[in-house]
Amino acid sequence: MSNLRIVCQHCPSVVFNNKRPDVVKRPTMSAMLHSETQEDLETDDFFLLKDPFAFDNVSVSKPLANNYKLLACADCEKGPLGYYDSKNNEYLLLCSLEKN
């Protein structure tokens, strides 16, 4: 299995450079922030991480709606790069950040 390297879109910092994680479908960031329920939400593809130490360089926001936290670059503080779902202990990094 190859490595996945994600570089911040706003600065040269490497956010993730590790073994390629599984891809999962989860609610989009917009959907999960604006919905009271988790039923029939629009989904997006995310890289699923369970360990925050798998990241090279990420910051986590204060809790938002439904106890979700946004992920951002720890150097420039820009994002969001994905979100943390505290209920399921999942760090979800947007697949769209991968450069082919």
Curated annotation (Swiss-Prot):
Belongs to the DSS4/MSS4 family. The keyword Cytoplasm does not apply. It comes from Schizosaccharomyces pombe (strain 972 / ATCC 24843). InterPro entries: Mss4 (IPR007515), Mss4-like_sf (IPR011057), Mss4/transl-control_tumour (IPR011323). One of its GO terms (cellular component) is membrane. GO terms for molecular function: guanyl-nucleotide exchange factor activity; zinc ion binding. One of its GO terms (biological process) is post-Golgi vesicle-mediated transport. Keywords: Guanine-nucleotide releasing factor, Metal-binding, Protein transport, Transport, Zinc. This is Guanine nucleotide exchange factor MSS4 homolog. Zn(2+) binds at residues 8, 11, 73, 76. Guanine-nucleotide-releasing protein that acts on members of the sec4/ypt1/rab subfamily.
